[in-house]
């Protein structure tokens, strides 16, 4: 029970949430006075777990303390060394913890033709991943955007396979604009986390792409891009991309939510991009505080500090802070 934040309908009301068999079966509004708030869980919309130097299971143990309940992970770093077996390891390891990991099929293994790599993943192997691993929701970031623009048959074959299986395609196109960007986006590339200016982000939004606003350990575009969120919140998500362990222990997506509020972003809009949009975009099995949804939510102390009191995934308390 608590003050329930209905992000989708932009309202806050006191109420009780009833959970059974991992799902919310009933939400009852009442007139009680509560000190705490209940919100949907946070989602990292683009993450390379390898940068944390942790396994998925170990990463999850820290992330849930900050209210993260799910992440969309591109395992192309381990795949560049171990190929398909590396991806399978990440997926299998992620199954060991109560956390909602989703993965992409890496499109850039090797990343460039000049790279000394340990593996190659072609379109046929991408298709095998889509067929055999339901955790894989998307074709991983298409980093070689020049290959797309120049209609390289190998990268286009991977994109075609993704569309064949109804999978989204993530992007990676820093600084790309004009006709080249239009051609890149025309292949159904749906996101980009590599924008450095608001102008660049808005051009991509106008072409139908979603912008993943990033603040990680390696690159930080959050402060530059977050002002677009009040108007374009429906087309934004939050991500860390790369998160080193010393930064992860300090905070995760929760820190970006607080930073967004301080920057003047409306409460419901910052929660929309932190909690709701990744679920809708990637079709994730993550609850959004609605009846019949999975019981994935956070109990927090207030709407300023966002201190996480409990993190709940599939109706189970996976972390609790005094």
Where on the chain are the PLM-derived regions?
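Histidine/acidic-residue-rich catalytic or RNA/ligand-binding cores of hydrolases
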Residues: 55, 84-87, 151, 178-185, ...
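Hydrophobic faces of well-ordered beta-strands that scaffold small-molecule active sites
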Residues: 41-49, 71-73, 101-105, 138-141, ...
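His/Asp/Glu-enriched, well-ordered alpha-helical/loop segment
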Residues: 228-306, 312
């Amino acid at each position: 029970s608590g003050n329930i934040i209905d992000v989708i309908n932009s309202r806050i009301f006191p109420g009780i949430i009833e959970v059974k068999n991992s799902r919310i079966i009933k939400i009852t509004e009442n007139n009680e006075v509560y000190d705490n708030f209940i919100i949907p869980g946070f989602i990292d919309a683009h993450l390379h777990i390898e940068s944390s130097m942790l396994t998925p299971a170990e990463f999850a143990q820290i992330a849930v303390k900050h209210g993260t309940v799910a992440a969309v992970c591109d395992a192309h770093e381990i795949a560049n060394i171990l190929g398909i077996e590396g991806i399978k390891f990440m997926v299998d390891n992620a199954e060991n913890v109560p956390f909602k990991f989703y993965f992409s099929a890496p499109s850039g293994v090797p990343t460039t033709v000049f790279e000394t790599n340990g593996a190659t993943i072609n379109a046929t192997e991408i298709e095998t991943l889509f067929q055999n691993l339901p955790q894989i929701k998307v074709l991983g970031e298409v980093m070689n955007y020049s290959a797309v623009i120049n209609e390289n048959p190998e990268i286009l074959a991977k994109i075609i396979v993704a569309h064949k299986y109804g999978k989204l395609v993530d992007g990676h196109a820093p600084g790309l604009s004009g006709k080249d960007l239009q051609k890149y986006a025309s292949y159904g590339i749906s996101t980009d986390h590599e924008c450095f200016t608001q102008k660049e982000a808005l051009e991509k939004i106008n072409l139908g792409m979603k912008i993943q606003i990033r603040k990680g350990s390696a690159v930080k575009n959050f402060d530059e891009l977050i002002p677009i969120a009040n108007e374009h919140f429906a087309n934004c998500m939050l991500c860390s991309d790369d998160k080193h362990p010393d930064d992860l222990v300090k905070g995760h997506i929760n820190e970006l939510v607080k930073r967004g509020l301080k920057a003047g972003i409306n409460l419901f809009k910052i929660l929309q991009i932190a909690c709701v949009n990744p679920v809708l975009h990637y079709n994730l099995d993550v609850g959004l505080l609605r009846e019949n949804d999975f019981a994935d939510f956070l109990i927090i102390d207030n709407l300023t500090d966002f201190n996480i009191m409990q993190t709940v995934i599939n109706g189970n308390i996976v972390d609790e802070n005094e």
